[in-house]
UniProtKB/Swiss-Prot annotation:
One of its GO terms (cellular component) is cytoplasm. Belongs to the FAD-dependent glycerol-3-phosphate dehydrogenase family. GO terms for biological process: glycerol metabolic process; glycerol-3-phosphate catabolic process. PROSITE patterns: FAD_G3PDH_1, FAD_G3PDH_2. Its EC number is 1.1.5.3. It catalyses: a quinone + sn-glycerol 3-phosphate = dihydroxyacetone phosphate + a quinol. It comes from Pseudomonas aeruginosa (strain ATCC 15692 / DSM 22644 / CIP 104116 / JCM 14847 / LMG 12228 / 1C / PRS 101 / PAO1). Its main location: cytoplasm. The gene is glpD. This is Glycerol-3-phosphate dehydrogenase. It is found in: Cytoplasm.
């Protein structure tokens, strides 16, 4: 493939669609639109997936608890999307069994069985096994009084990589993707949108577009009010969700879904083979979405829920890492944060022949692809040349000709006998079949360059900077990879030094 780079957009260029926001919804819409033949520009004020999209529970799931709120349409769509995404991205999406311990005073067994029956049959389920009842023995990690439970299927995903892969797909279909670029203002003039943009170095430029998509996530309403000088058609409620990561709490590759006295649920999920991720919380958030952080109350809450279920008791000192994000949910006036709909709402503004503004409110990681299709359906009247929907069967980058992570790991081990098995597995899970591009021209370990710690080599860092918009250590350690837990503080400092030396400023990204 050619090494053509994404150029700085000249002032006079006109795009079909400009997308503001580099989270999962923004990149999903950009990829879908570009694949249908539209010229697309996307800007993200920080890094791809830097906020909400990398702070999720990292699940592709129907949302079992949404059935209690009668969200049947959302659950049906999400359940069907599990199978679609499992086929599109088998390297970053994997089946996961969930164990639900039964606590009779919270929900009776008949209610759980009924919910799981619906969950098994509401959506298309071909690859994932059905739910079943369980009996726990003395060897269970759960407390002795918890003797019965249920088990069902969903999927786990690397959330930030799902975003990056969609951005790569958009770029490979011709889209221009600009990170660290903020849309300062946008206005309609002479049938076009005029966007004024500011790079992280303070330089300014402008573009024009025939349609504007506001996928700014937590900033969606603020963008309409402050940057477009209009009234937002919907209110947004920012709901904080926080997670903690602790050393591996139990053996096995299954997750737990834990019921709490407040009728909320908390997940305990295997994380990077060595850890357990616990979350999430639900509470209103009023501050700057970019500065959200877990509170002491949330930490205590998560520990209390886990300690009510497991024999092994956790304390705050056991927490290795925490992360928090805000979910920008469409305000449906629900009393409780956990009851607010996770469904998405699209708002189209295009009166009197004006160029359209499409704003995205709400949504969840699992249904991003369907949201993007819905967005393109709304924009279709404005683009006579719009191609048909295409994303359902198209693999995401790295999912092409991919049998399984295990088979790809075996191929890597056979071709590169010197390659550490654990590293081969991580690369297969991270890059899928694109790993062959990462290793192009590599004949031995020396060709990987400096080992920066935790299985991270200079070769991979260079690849991420050149092909995946990475610019600083956080981009690499917490989003492109999840190696932040594996590098010591001094190794992280060395990575920063390497980036400053070898990649001091890389606003352009070459085609992969």
């Amino acid at each position: 493939m050619s090494q053509a780079h994404t150029p700085s957009a000249p002032l006079a260029e006109v795009y079909d669609v400009a997308v503001v926001g580099g989270g999962i919804n923004g990149v999903g819409i950009a990829a879908d639109a570009a694949g249908r033949g539209l010229s697309v520009f996307l800007c993200e004020q920080h890094d791809l997936a830097q906020h909400t999209s990398s702070a999720s529970s990292k699940l592709i799931h129907g949302g079992l608890r949404y059935l209690e709120h009668y969200e049947f349409r959302l659950v049906r769509e999400a359940l069907a999307e599990r199978e679609v995404l499992l086929a599109k991205a088998p390297h970053i999406v994997k089946p996961l069994r969930f164990v639900l311990p039964h606590r009779p005073h919270l929900r009776p067994a008949w209610m759980i069985r009924a919910g799981l029956f619906l969950y098994d049959h509401l959506g298309k389920r071909e690859k994932l096994p059905a739910s079943r009842g369980l009996r726990f023995t003395g060897s269970s990690p759960l407390k002795a009084e918890i003797r019965r439970g249920f088990e069902y299927s969903d999927c786990a995903v690397d959330d930030a990589r799902l975003v990056v892969l969609n951005a790569i797909s958009a770029r490979e279909h011709g889209a221009h993707v600009h990170t660290r670029t903020r849309c300062v203002s946008a206005r309609r003039s002479k049938g076009l949108w005029h966007l004024h943009l500011e790079r992280s170095d303070g330089s300014l430029y402008s573009i024009r577009a025939r349609a504007l998509v506001n996928a700014a996530g937590p900033w969606v309403a603020r963008f309409i009010q402050d940057d477009l000088k209009q009234k937002s058609p919907y209110g947004i409620r920012l709901i904080q969700g926080s997670h903690i990561i602790v050393p591996k709490l139990y053996e096995g590759e299954h997750a737990y879904i834990l019921q709490n006295e407040d009728r909320r649920i908390v997940f305990a999920i295997p994380y990077l083979d060595r850890f357990t991720m616990i979350g999430t919380t639900d509470r209103e958030y009023q501050g700057d979405p970019a500065k959200v952080a877990i509170s002491e109350e949330e930490t205590a809450y998560l520990l209390q829920v886990v300690n009510a279920h497991f024999k092994q008791q956790l304390a705050a000192a056991d927490i290795l890492h925490s992360f928090a994000g805000v979910r920008p949910l469409c305000d449906d006036e629900s009393d409780e944060p956990s009851a607010i709909t996770r469904d998405y709402t699209l708002s189209l503004s295009a009166g009197n022949g004006e160029p359209p503004l499409l704003s995205v409110f709400g949504g969840k990681l699992t249904t991003y692809r369907k949201l993007a299709e819905s967005a393109l359906t709304q924009l279709q009247p404005f683009f006579a040349n719009l191609g048909p929907a295409w994303t359902a069967k198209a693999p995401l980058p790295g999912g092409e000709q991919m049998q399984s992570v295990e088979a790809l790991t075996e191929q890597l081990a056979n071709r590169y006998a010197w390659l550490d098995r654990e590293l081969a597995l991580r690369w297969a899970r991270t890059y899928g079949t694109r790993v062959w591009r990462l290793l192009d021209g590599v004949n031995g370990e020396a060709d990987l360059g400096e080992h920066l710690g935790g299985g991270l080599y200079a070769r991979e860092v260079d690849y991420l900077c050149k092909h995946e918009w990475a610019q600083d250590a956080e981009d690499i350690l917490w989003r492109r990879s999840k190696l932040g837990l594996f590098l010591s503080p001094s190794q992280q400092v060395r990575l920063g030094q390497y980036l400053q030396s070898e990649h001091p400023h890389r606003p352009r990204v070459h085609a992969a």
